[in-house]
Amino acid sequence: MKEQHKQFLARYGSKEHIDKLVKDKNLDVRYNLAGNPSLHKEHMDELVKDKNLDVRYNLAGNPSLHKEHMDTLVDDEDRNVRKNLARNPNLHKEHMDTLVDDEDKWVRWNLAMNTSLHKEHIDKLANDKDELVLNKIKNHPNYKSP
């Protein structure tokens, strides 16, 4: 099968196609698969362990990501994965609780863009030590200046 066809199936294919593609050697195929909002839990189980950070990065931004996969990705060693998770519109509160204290300012900056943020997280980011994070949270639609 041609690589281009595999990439298309990774995004739009049936479960049977995806079953075959989840362990494909081609990074682009797995990357496209990770962003598929119709991805089944069993496929996410495989992709959350992928050694390639680009695959985990794309999975972290998937709006259909299951809580248990967020549990894993919230502690990912790569900040880019955590940054994309921070932007996920369906991020669970407990993961916001973790990411709001992330040591990396860019993770917190990306969290400040998440329109699903709870008031307590907005308030905490409004007192962040980093100027970039402060400026970003002040542009949040639910931010109320003191």
Mark where each language-model region is.
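Alpha-helical scaffold segments
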Residues: 1-146
